[in-house]
Amino acid sequence: MPLNRTLSMSSLPGLEDWEDEFDLENTVLFEVAWEVANKVGGIYTVLQTKAKVTGDEWGDNYYLVGPYTEQGVRTQVELLEPPTPALKRTLDSMNSKGCKVYFGRWLIEGGPLVVLLDVGASAWALERWKGELWDTCNIGVPWYDREANDAVLFGFLTTWFLGEFLAQSEEKPHVVAHFHEWLAGVGLCLCRARRLPVATIFTTHATLLGRYLCAGAVDFYNNLENFNVDKEAGERQIYHRYCMERAAAHCAHVFTTVSQITAIEAQHLLKRKPDIVTPNGLNVKKFSAMHEFQNLHAQSKARIQEFVRGHFYGHLDFNLDKTLYFFIAGRYEFSNKGADVFLEALARLNYLLRVNGSEQTVVAFFIMPARTNNFNVETLKGQAVRKQLWDTANTVKEKFGRKLYESLLVGSLPDMNKMLDKEDFTMMKRAIFATQRQSFPPVCTHNMLDDSSDPILTTIRRIGLFNSSADRVKVIFHPEFLSSTSPLLPVDYEEFVRGCHLGVFPSYYEPWGYTPAECTVMGIPSVSTNLSGFGCFMEEHIADPSAYGIYILDRRFRSLDDSCSQLTSFLYSFCQQSRRQRIIQRNRTERLSDLLDWKYLGRYYMSARHMALAKAFPEYFTYEPHEADATQGYRYPRPASVPPSPSLSRHSSPHQSEDEEEPRDLPPDEDDERYDEDEEAAKDRRNIRAPEWPRRASCTSSTGSKRGSVDTAPSSSVSTPSEPLSPASSLGEERN
């Protein structure tokens, strides 16, 4: 299987140098995950967005392996004949022995080839395979856990496929198998147990036990080393799942996580230190003109404003031109996603805006799917009233315009008293009467099944944000995924994000965090935390994140009340910005999108694959492990111009250097004079796209001189190429 090219690791700035080039000829990559062409959670986004970059590297030697689902194949996959004789013989052999294996092309950007295994069609072998799993790995799976049983079937089918592929290949290829999450982990364990010549990688995107523990309101990060992991997993009836995850982590040639914070978590809960961190990226669409994404923001904001006009009919006593739209979105995990902190901060922000007589109004959206039975009647009525008013205004406008045209046509000025007749005034009075409302605008757009016990609604009742006229902060809970076909808010998620001013994601447990990353690539400022993978990554790479519209909330070193106060300060300072300052900040935020592009972050996966090849096939690939020296990293400096608002240019971490000088505040007029958008854009893009990555003198070098803004902190024991140590990466030491 010729690939006809080689790839030099030394060509990638910031990664450790390699003495020899890796020849990828006769090397095949299989990426195995339950979410291949099967949307369940965030791993689907990782695979979908990464496919093009990986395909560009591996060509036709890259395959994704996932479960067969009728819905997924019907809408996302084009079934094809296998392109190589070895692959065709493999599928024919498995299908002839009672399996159902499909081959096709995933209809996403990059069009990767996929192998889909029908788990249900192989259920006849479940009990036998569960017995073999017990004999091989001492992992027992209860009959009632359907998800775990599916993982067993999927794992055995994956191992069968890989073994059959190797047997059917005339020229034995070097196979790399990359497994994502515990649902695919059984296959990795079996590959090692059967001694298949396969280089294995296991990536955990979030530990099972970590998610369960954080949902239970424990002081998770301060007690990582104190948890009895077997006892905790057993009490939550996930011990068998935990064993699958832990076994996969220990069996893999290379173990990776998506962030430094998750690496520390995995080290304590899974008892293995990750070999490398592989951050998640996105496919970034660059605009030909700087103002293009600003125009998209204005267009999307207009769509949101139409919804707000209808939702707040009868109480629309605030200026929409002085209204800011904040939002939080994601899985409905009230504490893990930080919805509790956001609501408390909104209550404090409402108080500050009221006592200071601010003209700004904030509308905060909560986009979190929950159990509902229908739309709220008042919400539907609001949109109907808005449409009726629009139709009435258009009717009167047409009649007025026609009479004006006829009057001007004959060369005379119109008599304004005759432009509208009695019928027109009656129509307008009826429209005004329709806007009368006795109750406050609803907080929730749907009827909740558990209204009395819903965490968001219960908290709103406690803090008293009922969308009254006196409130400067309005709250809208939309417990459903956004859709352009919705009768309430007819926009998709991407358009909604573009129309908002600030995304707020004060998560307590967030191994990576795609929502703030999506905000960044769309030029929308966001709030993240130093307990999220995204927040830690940005703190490591940006000297002053808030100046670029990335506000890092400290939830690691502060109490819950202090974190709420810090978030309130962020939100209030954001409300004080002028429109021009927000435009400048959005420009800066959008410039960071290069940092989150798979073209940049894909190098971490590349490094993990090369490490696995070197460990599995040492006679063909060489790898010299060494600690990254102090110069292996770079922090983007503050923007060239003054910060976007007088109070925001500061580090959010309490551990920043005290000798760093804060920029001098300037009056608005001086700010405008100093700011040159084109000049600053050029400087920022030079910082982001072409940082001066230092090169090590040799593979064993462990020291380096300071250059520019290179972070010279001691490096982490987890190998993370091109990344300096962050506060989050030293949690183990901080706990002591």
Swiss-Prot record:
Entry binding sites for UDP: 39, 331, 515
Binding site for alpha-D-glucose 6-phosphate: 291-292, 294, 297, 301, 501, 582, 586
GO biological process entries: glycogen biosynthetic process
Keyword Glycosyltransferase: yes
Domain of life per record: Eukaryota
Ranges of compositional bias, category Low complexity: 714-727
Keyword annotations: Allosteric enzyme, Glycogen biosynthesis, Glycosyltransferase, Phosphoprotein, Transferase
Pfam family for this entry, one: Glycogen_syn
Residue(s) carrying Phosphoserine: 8, 11, 412, 641, 645, 649, 652-653, 657, 698, 709, 726, 730
Activity regulation note: Allosteric activation by glucose-6-phosphate. Phosphorylation reduces the activity towards UDP-glucose. When in the non-phosphorylated state, glycogen synthase does not require glucose-6-phosphate as an allosteric activator; when phosphorylated it does.
PANTHER family referenced in this protein's UniProt entry, alphabetically: GLYCOGEN [STARCH] SYNTHASE, MUSCLE, GLYCOGEN SYNTHASE
Entry's family note: Belongs to the glycosyltransferase 3 family.
Protein's job: Glycogen synthase participates in the glycogen biosynthetic process along with glycogenin and glycogen branching enzyme. Extends the primer composed of a few glucose units formed by glycogenin by adding new glucose units to it. In this context, glycogen synthase transfers the glycosyl residue from UDP-Glc to the non-reducing end of alpha-1,4-glucan.
Protein name, entry field: Glycogen [starch] synthase, muscle
